[in-house]
Amino acid sequence: MKKNFDDLAERTPFAIPNNIKLGITKIKSLPLPDKLDCNLNKNHICLITDDGSELTIQLANSLIKEEWQVIILSFPGSIIPQKLPLSKEIKRMILVDLTEEHLKQQLDSVINNNGLIGAFIHLNPITVSATKAKTILKHIFLMAKLLKISLNEISKSQRSWFITVTHLDGKLGLGENNNFQSITGGLFGLTKTLNLEW
């Protein structure tokens, strides 16, 4: 049901042209997305951040079935304490601190020992404190900075990915359940901006 906004012009300090219709935003259910078949070169790496949940393992196993090389990046235990056991096919890289130098050293080690990183998937943890969420966000910004060369090099010949996965309320943050840190919205801005910046 649309509301009549004709009297809105009288209540606002500016005039609204008569030919512009105003409406109320509401949530609309969308159909499930189709599957996009994407292949990563077998000589390239898919780096996934560990959110401490089964999702990390499920995603890694799904990509391995597609013959992707997967490495899991785990944050220090002070940020995400839970690290579920991985299968033999999955390598894990654990950050011992959150400095840019250490992250660069670890990424260089992955590239030198395994090949270029062609896909990065950040799985944002569901429940962390605001301080930890801010620390993770900062580190993902650093990750974007440090992966720029690798991802751009690969994109010259095939698709490369920088993906962030967040958990909201299923209603784009507009629902009643707000069991998430609002600072993680910075991930949306980061992924949106990378395409413009790179």
Model region roles, listed by residue range:
Residues 124-126, 136-139, 159-196:
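Catalytic loop of short-chain dehydrogenase/reductase
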Residues 1-142:
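Flexible, low-complexity flanking/linker segments at catalytic domain boundaries
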Residues 83-88, 155-157, 176:
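Intrinsically disordered, low-complexity coil segments
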Residues 146-159, 197:
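A short helix-coil junction within the Rossmann-fold of NAD(P)-dependent oxidoreductases
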Residues 58, 145, 149, 189, ...:
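Alpha-helical scaffold segments in soluble metabolic enzymes
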Residues 63, 195-198:
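A generic structural signal for well-ordered alpha-helical segments
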Residues 54, 126, 152, 196-197:
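A very general structural signal that marks isolated residues within well-ordered alpha-helical segments
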